[in-house]
From Swiss-Prot:
GO BP annotations, alphabetical order: 1-deoxy-D-xylulose 5-phosphate biosynthetic process; glyceraldehyde-3-phosphate metabolic process; terpenoid biosynthetic process; thiamine biosynthetic process
Alphabetical list of PANTHER family matching this protein: 1-D-DEOXYXYLULOSE 5-PHOSPHATE SYNTHASE-RELATED, 1-DEOXY-D-XYLULOSE-5-PHOSPHATE SYNTHASE, CHLOROPLASTIC
Record-given protein name: 1-deoxy-D-xylulose-5-phosphate synthase 2
UniProt-listed NCBIfam families: dxs (TIGR00204), PRK05444.2-2 (NF003933)
Assembly and interaction partners: Homodimer.
SMART domains to which the protein is assigned, alphabetical: Transket_pyr
Keyword line: Isoprene biosynthesis, Magnesium, Metal-binding, Thiamine biosynthesis, Thiamine pyrophosphate, Transferase
Reactions catalysed according to its record: D-glyceraldehyde 3-phosphate + pyruvate + H(+) = 1-deoxy-D-xylulose 5-phosphate + CO2
Pfam families, per the entry: DXP_synthase_N, Transket_pyr, Transketolase_C
UniProt xrefs under Gene3D superfamilies: 3.40.50.920, 3.40.50.970
Function: Catalyzes the acyloin condensation reaction between C atoms 2 and 3 of pyruvate and glyceraldehyde 3-phosphate to yield 1-deoxy-D-xylulose-5-phosphate (DXP).
The organism of origin for this protein: Zymomonas mobilis subsp. mobilis (strain ATCC 31821 / ZM4 / CP4)
Ligand binding (Mg(2+)): 151, 180
């Protein structure tokens, strides 16, 4: 099945059970072959490479020591699990990663019994593993639950909430802290290795339990002094006092690329009679692949690449991305206004704020994986008179919703939200899709919600946000590139809650929010060719809705189509609510809403995802045709008074 002669040992491994039959001395060769296969696969598909290369040895050791899938491995985030997938029966599909009908780039329960818990967002692993561990305890089972979490994910409060609650799970819960930035402490050579093996050994842990019992019988003052001495000694030796204060038995640091260190330590903690236990493993992203080791980002996420040179395939030239348009316009605004500051949650590159930071390092705040804090931090800055732009992916803004309501909207604070990756996101699939921000933002009193139809509109909206101080305001924009309109010239401050009529018709009206405008215009051309005169409006604002324009369109057309790149409850709901409140549908007006379907769409190319959702020209034409085929009453023809925008460049 696998003719690659460079991986003879890996070729024999179809399941972890077969891995566990190997002689321990063979594991180094297996790890080397697994690293080659991971690089080769990502060279074909693109994806997250550096993090997977950093856990090759750890992945081998975990499956060798623990009885997976009976013992549950719960990977945080999941983008480091390509090697795990190769070892768990999915090697034959590994070159379908992140493609239509292919393997997910993250863990997915429906994909394999070895994926104990699905993940793609950070800092969930300890909570989930605690659930598995408590289920094991309640079932009187000895099955282990192992959370593998990176040091970056430890910046999120959820990880500490779980650790604070973990003591009840006892020995069944093991947390592997994968420290790949050496941000906590580096291993300190032979002494560190010896101490890690020693303090994880059964005799040492038994002795410590005995001494704990002795201390508990001491007078209060002596007992307190003894505990402090124990903490001091362990802190000097290992640096783990903080985790011990949370109720964990700390082991480490351990060299995560040395199987001779890893395996004995993991065996010791597996067989421990007390817990929970945290094992601090130090790794290096991109380990074993020179181009990744040399790269600044350690090849965290890559395009398809030449595995020999490490050179990545370059995207064809085209219009700038929406993210870069946002970033460049924000830099221009900040040069004119020193009250503008920016906040991101561990995504400076993804949100374009790395560019902003080059110009204004003291005005860009990366708060780590802490979206709740990011939103309230922005609220505090706004309350103090600054102009914060809180820049988050749509899917991660979900984590800060209570703060949106309680700390921003209720107080009507002028926080600017830049909601990146809105709508469908292609290869990252359902976990990273920005499906819901429209629905949860338009429901908030005081909130202004905008969506640009092209890159110039985005620049106008950023300019408008910089000059809006009446309350919170947001702009949502998609992953990918613009449509190619000119960005030259002065940007305009848009009147709040005012859309623009792009094309005038008489029978069908398409109300478009966001970047579906291009498809709406294509559909209008086809409908006009069929004798169905079609108006097209770029609504710009989901909230406040342009009620005057909406009212005119609803009164003067037989079929109304709304289209948006969001789930049920967003822009269309605003239109339908207004139509219902004003009785505009009472005489037979047909309104059809095109939005994301009520299901989680799997990974695919973006435009294919939108076509599948019916959010393209074909979908619009089909919706109009279906609406007209139903019986309808005549509609009074009212002359439109809104002028067509003269400078429309699409």
């Amino acid at each position: 099945m696998f003719p690659n002669k460079k991986t003879p040992l890996l070729d024999k491994i179809k399941t972890p059970a077969e891995l566990r039959q190997l002689d321990r001395n063979s594991l180094r060769q297996l790890a080397d072959e697994l690293r080659k296969e991971t690089i080769s696969a990502v060279g074909v598909t693109g994806g997250h490479l550096g993090s997977g290369l950093g856990v090759i040895e750890l992945t081998v050791a975990l499956h060798y020591v623990f009885n997976t899938p009976k013992d549950a491995l719960v990977w945080d985030v999941g983008h480091q699990t390509y090697p795990h997938k190769i070892l768990t029966g999915r090697r034959d599909r590994i070159r379908t990663l992140r493609q239509r009908d292919g393997l997910s780039g993250f863990t997915q329960r429906a994909e394999s019994e070895y994926d104990a818990f699905g993940a793609a967002h950070s800092s969930t692993s300890i909570s989930a593993a605690l659930g598995f561990a408590m289920a094991s305890k309640l079932s009187d089972s000895d099955d282990k639950a192992v959370a593998i979490i990176g040091d970056g994910s430890m910046t999120a409060g959820m990880a500490y909430e779980a650790m604070n609650n973990a003591k009840a799970a006892g020995k069944r819960l093991i947390v592997i802290l994968n420290d790949n930035e050496m941000s906590i402490s580096p291993p300190v050579g032979a002494l560190s290795s010896y101490l890690s093996r020693l303090i994880s050994s059964r005799p040492f842990m038994n002795l410590r339990d005995i001494m704990r019992g002795v201390v508990n019988r001491m007078p209060k003052g002596l007992a307190t002094a003894a505990r402090k001495a124990d903490e001091y000694a362990r802190g000097m030796a290992t640096g783990g006092t903080f985790f011990e204060e949370l109720g964990f038995y700390y082991v480490g640091p351990v060299d995560g690329h040395n199987l001779d260190q890893l395996i004995p330590v993991l065996e010791n903690v597996r067989d421990a009679k007390d817990g929970p236990i945290l094992v601090h493993v130090v790794t290096r992203k991109g380990q074993g692949y020179a181009p990744a080791e040399a790269a600044k980002d350690k090849y965290h996420a890559v395009q398809r690449l030449d595995v020999v040179s490490g050179k990545q395939a370059k995207a064809p030239p085209g219009p700038p991305s929406y993210t870069s348009v946002f970033s460049e316009q924000l830099i221009k605004e900040a040069k004119q206004d020193d009250k503008i500051v920016t906040i991101t949650a561990a995504m400076p590159t993804g949100t374009g704020l790395d560019r902003f930071q080059q110009y204004f390092p003291e005005r860009m705040f990366d708060v780590g994986i802490a979206e709740q804090h990011a939103v309230t931090f922005a609220a505090g800055l706004a309350a103090a008179g600054y102009k914060p732009f809180c820049c988050l992916y749509s899917t991660f803004l979900q984590r800060g919703y209570d703060q949106l309501v309680h700390d921003v909207a209720i107080q009507n604070l002028p926080v600017r939200f830049a909601v990146d990756r809105a709508g469908l996101v292609g290869a990252d699939g359902a976990t990273h899709a920005g499906s819901f921000d429209l629905a949860f933002m338009v429901n908030l009193p005081n909130m202004v919600v905008m969506a640009p139809s092209d890159e110039r509109e985005l620049a106008n909206m950023v300019h408008s946000m910089a000059h809006y101080d009446q309350g919170p305001i947001s702009v949502r924009y998609p992953r990918g590139n613009g449509v190619g309109v000119s960005l030259e010239g002065e940007k305009e401050i848009l009147p709040i809650g005012k859309g623009r009529l792009i094309r005038r018709g008489k029978k069908v009206a398409i109300l478009s929010l966001g970047t579906r405008l291009e498809e709406s215009l294509k559909a209008a051309d086809r409908l006009d060719a069929q004798g169905l005169s079609t108006s097209v409006a770029d609504m710009r604002f989901a909230k406040p809705l342009d009620e005057a324009l909406t009212r005119q369109l609803l009164k003067s057309h037989q079929v109304i189509i709304t289209i948006e790149e969001g789930a049920l409850g967003g822009f269309a709901t605003q239109v339908l609510t207004m139509a219902s409140d004003e009785g505009l549908m009472d005489d037979g007006l047909k309104i059809r809403t095109l939005r994301l379907p009520d299901r989680f769409q799997p990974q695919d190319k973006q435009e294919r995802q939108y076509a599948e959702a019916g959010l393209d020209a074909d979908g619009i034409v089909a919706a109009v045709t279906a609406a007209l085929q139903r019986n309808s009453k005549p509609v009074e023809v009212v002359e439109l008074t809104t002028k067509v925008t003269e400078d429309m460049t699409l």
